[in-house]
């Protein structure tokens, strides 16, 4: 009997689980894969909705949990949480001894998993390398993960070329599309109206989703927030604020959003939604407003407009459904108004998403289940030097 491949996948929060859900489903079901799902960070935090429960509810399963997140709202707290994660994951991976570890995207917590994998000589597979988000530390994290990894699954061909330009051997780099788009193509989403009603919205009336996070590359990570709230104060329609990521400044975002919601009965603050409920709510929204990659990468797949505020997503590819705007109240108001015009709404129906077709999981599975995970994967070689 063929030995099963020991593959560990790390997940820290709803931010990456919404991408990983179908890949975890396929890995768990594959007869030649021994999957270990390791959850840590915000997943285990009651403050951020204890989203580890989403994994079990979706059938992904959780094999190991590692407590790592300090109760903090500072950059020092982030740095210390990273150290705690490194200690905890070192023990976990030393005991599990996976043959391959899968990390996703650009969350700073992933650096802990990558560092442990490096020192334990475990090959690393990285999903979503080569993307850009120049207004956050995520960009540097993503590039660091690329150089620490041995397999790369990129969202676009442009991202694939960037990874190769960083010195990675082309055979290691696979363009698969964005994993999160598999949420649209695999199974039917719950009715948007039903999800809206469950969180207190009037399903018959328009709603806007606001998804915004601290700009972690800035000293004042929430400097954009007053302009955002000023713009939203004159918006006609229901508003759903989604909790931010667990970064420095997140509590400021939560506090001000909650205060804003207290002044208007049509404003709701949601800690977390399961991935498919979030996608359903987004599919029925008038627009998504904020600085989340969800608007830039995902909204086009459900033909929804996105207003991208500020610098957090600078450099990231996006479709024509996205309207970029500086963090200025009047500019934000004008951008929202543009997305609600009849011509823009009509054009949305035919706008393409540059991040793929929603079949990324099956492409990743083909590589993970066939690639040689021996020494040839672990040992990387620099590209040949140009000769004069």
Where are these regions (language model features)?
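A short, Lys/Arg-enriched amphipathic alpha-helix followed by its capping loop at the start of a domain
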Residues: 23-33, 231-235
């Amino acid at each position: 009997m063929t030995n099963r491949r020991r593959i560990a996948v790390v997940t820290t929060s709803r931010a990456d689980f919404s991408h990983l859900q179908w890949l975890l489903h396929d890995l768990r079901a594959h007869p030649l894969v021994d999957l270990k799902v390791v959850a840590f960070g915000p997943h285990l935090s009651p403050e951020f909705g204890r989203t580890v429960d989403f994994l079990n509810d979706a059938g992904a399963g959780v094999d190991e949990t590692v407590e790592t997140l300090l109760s903090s709202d500072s950059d020092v707290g982030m740095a210390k949480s990273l150290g705690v994660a490194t200690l905890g994951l070192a023990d976990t991976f030393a005991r599990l001894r996976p043959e391959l570890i899968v990390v996703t995207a650009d969350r700073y917590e992933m650096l802990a998993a990558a560092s442990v994998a490096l020192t334990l000589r475990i090959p690393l597979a990285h999903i979503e390398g080569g993307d850009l988000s120049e207004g956050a530390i995520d960009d540097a994290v993503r590039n660091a993960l690329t150089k620490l990894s041995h397999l790369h699954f990129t969202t676009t061909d442009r991202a694939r070329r960037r990874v190769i330009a960083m010195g990675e051997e082309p055979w290691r780099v696979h363009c698969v599309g964005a994993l999160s788009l598999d949420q649209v193509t695999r199974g039917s989403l719950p009715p948007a109206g039903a999800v809206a009603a469950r969180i207190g919205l009037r399903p018959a009336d328009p709603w806007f989703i606001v998804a915004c996070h601290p700009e972690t590359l800035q000293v004042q990570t929430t400097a954009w927030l007053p302009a955002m709230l000023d713009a939203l104060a004159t918006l006609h329609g229901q508003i759903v604020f989604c909790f931010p990521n667990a970064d420095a400044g997140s509590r400021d975002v939560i506090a001000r959003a909650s205060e804003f919601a207290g002044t208007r009965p049509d404003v709701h603050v949601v800690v977390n939604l399961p991935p498919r409920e979030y996608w359903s709510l987004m599919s029925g929204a008038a627009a998504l407003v904020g600085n989340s990659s969800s608007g830039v990468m995902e909204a086009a797949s459900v033909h929804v407009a996105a207003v991208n505020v500020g610098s957090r997503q600078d450099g990231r590819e996006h479709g024509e459904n996205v309207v970029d705007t500086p963090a200025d109240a009047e500019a934000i108001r004008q951008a929202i108004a543009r997305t609600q015009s009849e011509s823009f709404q009509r054009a949305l129906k035919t706008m393409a998403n540059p991040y793929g077709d929603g079949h990324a999981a099956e492409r990743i599975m083909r590589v993970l289940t066939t690639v040689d995970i021996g020494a040839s994967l672990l040992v990387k070689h620099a590209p040949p030097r140009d000769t004069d």
